[in-house]
């Protein structure tokens, strides 16, 4: 075998191994059926992030939409506490519908993906009367100017009995230990 063929074969094996590893990792977790049902019924989600001291912030109610694969999308100002903490690597704790609704912890990231921006621009006015009449309505201009950003939250771990209490130690993104 030539050096080039060996290199390509090695790269192919490595990519296959990485794909298998990633598919089993928490970052590829999905929303539970309970969460999917709750997303369909809820008008708000409550989001908390992790402060520098490792404790949970206060849960804030926010408008939301989801992607077809049930990834949560919200928008916020680029200098909000949520955005600052997420840039620092904070996960997001999410309660669907109310502060004691179904909860999960997710990998949060700020993205400038035009498709996700467009989803928010399109979905919010359909879901929220205030956006329909022009109040707090997201627009491409706001995204382009950087006055709002998209936060994408991918569910990682279900939190079946977790309640929102600011100042408590935040749960880990790591999967729960089997019983």
What positions do the PLM features span?
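Short, structured beta-strand-loop surface elements
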Residues: 79-150, 154-156
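Extracellular/periplasmic catalytic domains that process cell-envelope and extracellular macromolecules
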Residues: 38-40, 56-58, 65-66, 87, ...
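Short beta-strand segments
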Residues: 42-78, 92-95, 103-105
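C-terminal edge-of-domain segments
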Residues: 28-31, 142-179
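Short N-terminal segments immediately surrounding and downstream of signal-peptide cleavage
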Residues: 29-48
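Bacterial N-terminal signal peptides
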Residues: 10-23
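N-terminal secretory signal peptides that target proteins for export/translocation
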Residues: 1-6
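Short, P/G- and charge-enriched loop/turn segments at secondary-structure junctions
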Residues: 33-35, 50-51, 136-141
């Amino acid at each position: 075998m030539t050096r080039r063929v060996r290199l390509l074969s090695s790269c192919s094996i490595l990519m296959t191994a990485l794909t298998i590893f990633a598919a089993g990792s928490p970052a590829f977790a999905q929303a539970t059926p309970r969460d999917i049902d709750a997303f369909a019924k809820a008008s708000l989600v409550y989001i908390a992030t992790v402060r520098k001291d490792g404790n949970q912030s206060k849960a804030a109610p926010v408008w939301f939409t989801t992607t077809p694969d049930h990834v949560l999308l919200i928008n916020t100002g680029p200098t909000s506490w949520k955005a600052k903490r997420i840039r620092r690597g904070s996960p997001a704790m999410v309660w669907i519908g109310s502060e004691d609704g179904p909860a999960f912890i997710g990998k949060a990231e700020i993205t400038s993906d035009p498709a996700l921006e467009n989803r928010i621009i399109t979905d919010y006015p359909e879901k929220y009367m205030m956006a329909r009449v022009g109040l707090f309505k997201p627009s491409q201009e706001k995204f382009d100017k950087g006055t709002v950003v998209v936060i994408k939250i991918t569910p990682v771990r279900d939190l079946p009995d977790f309640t929102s209490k600011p100042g408590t130690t935040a749960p880990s993104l790591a999967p729960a230990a089997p019983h």
